[in-house]
């Protein structure tokens, strides 16, 4: 199999990268009716598999789970989750031949084996669904020409997909049809019905492409969503402790600081996040973020280049074939870091203190979000896609760190995201560790910025620069569809 994206000519590549249209709510007037009366079989019962299935069943669809025979015989976690929630569970041979839509929600590294196992069992004219297009785009999986291939990609972890649905809402979602596999022209109708069944139509749906989803998703998770948070956590903790801060306080400031800071980002973008700072601190955070962008732009561009070319995917798949040696080594090294092993702080940190004492962290968030967005857009990805894969998902990832530090983040995200995170963080830490971190001033981290005087003209120009960045323009529109999403709890 060959990387699908690399088989396209330049015009086709640019066309696929640039596919992105925000769909009107009137386009979902029929909601999930196109799939009602049809049999949907989900392969895989992890976080996305279970929670999408629960939502789809509650939307009136006929849902069953196909698991490997050994998972059923040994009553593994996937079997327990499906049966405990009252779903029909059977082997591939039992359920796949009956399915009108087979939804593959297994991890990326299992996709080829799963698809090669289920494809011969699928009936003529059935549909195959994904929530991430890596198998199609990067692996280049070939699907039978009578099978329709669609994607519905919620832009949240599976648990959030369920919680927002239970509240009568949903999470922003990307949908797509594989242009090589839409023999009956029904792919978009299937994808729309599936998205509506998960509740995604209530929060906003982008009609995208498999290519645009994969390339933007990989870029976001490697850089700002995971890699920047990991690098920022390790660098900030070590800096605080080296300057005499209590390790327990330093750990809590960072562990819960990302969540607190990005909650403001979620509600009002970079503008609101920066507005939570005093005027002198805002000017300092802006200056730091510009400095960071200058230093880190080549690293962001390298990751985007390697994603576009397929270099990243080929390297990761080589590690799959080598029993994940690199991934497991990097995971072990992360677990041994000082931040991960620091004592817990019993005291309370007020919400505003996270901003006042975390000016560097605010600057890192701003720089990372803007760089990821700018790099994606300059590579042909449309602004709406770039927004969802940079700013939108960041509070959700930060929330995982608040639960159990970097360990929890790396457990919750996919192995693909985790591998990319380590690649980025392992390059970013040495890039910033010496010259940049050594140049920090008192008030950048661990203590509030001293002084109250500001230059009005400078403050005016900085405010205008923040508010006029393209991610703020598109973000204001997209956040208008998400006002009903719940607030992430912020720890004290």
Swiss-Prot record:
Mg(2+) 1 binds at residues 217, 221. Residues 14-208 form the KARI N-terminal Rossmann domain. Pfam families: KARI_C (PF01450), KARI_N (PF07991). It comes from the Bacteria. Substrate binds at residue 414. Pathway: Amino-acid biosynthesis; L-isoleucine biosynthesis; L-isoleucine from 2-oxobutanoate: step 2/4; Amino-acid biosynthesis; L-valine biosynthesis; L-valine from pyruvate: step 2/4. Binds 2 magnesium ions per subunit. Its EC number is 1.1.1.86. Its cofactor is Mg(2+). This is Ketol-acid reductoisomerase (NADP(+)). It comes from Pectobacterium carotovorum subsp. carotovorum (strain PC1).
């Amino acid at each position: 199999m060959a990387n699908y994206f690399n088989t396209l000519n330049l015009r086709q590549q640019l066309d696929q990268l640039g596919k992105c249209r925000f769909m009107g709510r009137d386009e979902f007037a029929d909601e999930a009716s196109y799939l009602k009366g049809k049999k949907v079989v989900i392969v895989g019962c992890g976080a996305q598999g279970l929670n999408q299935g629960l939502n789809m069943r509650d939307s009136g669809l006929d849902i069953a789970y196909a698991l490997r025979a050994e998972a059923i015989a040994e009553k593994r976690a996937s079997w327990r989750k499906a049966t405990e929630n009252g779903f029909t569970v059977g082997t591939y041979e039992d359920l796949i031949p009956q399915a009108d839509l087979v939804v593959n929600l297994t991890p990326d590294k299992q996709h080829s084996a799963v698809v090669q196992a289920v494809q011969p069992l699928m009936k003529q004219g059935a549909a195959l669904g994904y929530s991430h297009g890596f198998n199609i785009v990067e692996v280049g999986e070939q699907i039978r020409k009578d099978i329709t291939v669609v994607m519905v990609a919620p832009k949240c972890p599976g648990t959030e997909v369920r919680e927002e649905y239970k509240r009568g809402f949903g999470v922003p979602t990307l949908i797509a049809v594989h242009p090589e596999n839409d023999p009956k022209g029904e792919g978009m109708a299937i994808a729309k019905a599936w998205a509506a069944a998960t509740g995604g139509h209530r929060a906003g749906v982008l009609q995208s492409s498999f290519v645009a989803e994969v390339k933007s998703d990989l870029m976001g998770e490697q850089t700002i969503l995971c890699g920047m948070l990991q690098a920022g956590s390790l660098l900030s903790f070590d800096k605080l402790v080296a300057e005499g801060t209590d390790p327990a306080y330093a750990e809590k400031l960072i562990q819960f600081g990302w969540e607190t800071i990005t909650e403001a980002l979620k509600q009002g973008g970079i503008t609101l996040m920066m507005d939570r700072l005093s005027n002198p601190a805002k000017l300092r955070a802006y200056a730091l973020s510009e400095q960071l962008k200058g230093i880190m732009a080549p690293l962001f561009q390298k990751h985007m280049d390697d994603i576009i070319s397929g270099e990243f995917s080929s390297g990761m798949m080589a590690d799959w074939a080598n029993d994940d040696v690199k991934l497991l080594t990097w995971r072990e090294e992360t677990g041994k870091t000082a931040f991960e092993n620091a004592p817990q702080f019993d005291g309370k940190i007020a919400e505003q203190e996270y901003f006042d004492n975390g000016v560097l962290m605010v600057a890192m968030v701003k720089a990372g979000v803007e760089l990821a967005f700018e790099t994606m857009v300059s590579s042909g990805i449309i602004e709406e896609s770039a927004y969802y894969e940079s700013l939108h998902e960041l509070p959700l990832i930060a929330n995982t760190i608040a639960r159990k530090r970097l360990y929890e983040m790396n457990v919750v995200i996919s192995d693909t995201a985790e591998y990319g995170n380590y690649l980025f963080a392992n390059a970013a830490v040495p890039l910033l560790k010496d010259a940049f971190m050594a140049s920090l001033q008192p008030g950048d981290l661990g203590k509030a910025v001293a002084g109250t005087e500001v230059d009005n003209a400078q403050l005016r120009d900085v405010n205008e620069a923040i508010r006029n960045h393209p991610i703020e323009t598109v973000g204001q529109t997209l956040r208008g569809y998400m006002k009903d999403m719940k607030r992430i709890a912020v720890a004290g």
